Amino acid sequence: MTHSRAALVALLEEHGLTPSRALGQNFVVDANTVRRIARLSGVTAGDEVLEIGAGLGSLTLALVETGAHVTAMEVDRHLLGPLRAVLEPVGVSVHHADALVADYSAILTGPTTVVANLPYNVATPLVLHLLETQPLITRMLVMVQREVGERFAAHAGDEAYGAVSLRVQYYGDARVVGKVGPNVFVPRPKVESALVEIVRRARVRVDPAVVGEEELFTVVRTSFGQRRKMLRRSLHEWASEGVFERAGVDETRRPEELTLEEFARLAAAR
């Protein structure tokens, strides 16, 4: 049911389409890869699935094979005609929308899994936007540039660990569940991709009654503004007298060594 590489290339040629550099488009053209992504998404018959950036529908068709109820979103108006021609006969509704500003209340009707192949320039802001604003999205499987995926899933002490990792941890649990090479895309990217699963927590990881989100991430952002420096240097303008002692955090440590809970203690102790 999924597109073959030849069928996708023919579809592009038939409609006079070329992948948009401005939109960071790289279409997956390998049937085994899209079925693998659908399998890793964990969706089964009857589940609600939103695919963001449906492209030409190859991954969408693999998701349909699971028996899930699939809705597709695509920002590129040039793809809408061929995409709807492929998907509407198999019961998939296609929404023309920018995922960063879309009205999700018109799309989400219950707990939903998002599956998406995301371009580099959109991946981080979009994933954070969905975590922060769309509680009905309970799970995501996103394909992103490998470095971005490692950042999403990093923990204290990891090289990729930073403010983005902590923001993801605040809302959910992330892990890299697979890698995808460049040969399965048209056009072929210069980088490897990672498949990242993010499962939303039932409640945010730090109790807002203990420390507010804005206060917490102010200290996170300030610390990682000078990530290689000790906390006493990176936070010297932010920190009040005795804050490190009250928080039980050694001021000679570096931000990349601290857990989310330790940042929360700092924010609460200020």
Per-region residue spans from a language model:
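C-terminal lobe and adjacent flexible extensions of AdoMet/dcAdoMet transferase-like proteins
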Residues: 220-270
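Catalytic cores of RNA-modifying enzymes
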Residues: 1-222, 226, 245, 265-268
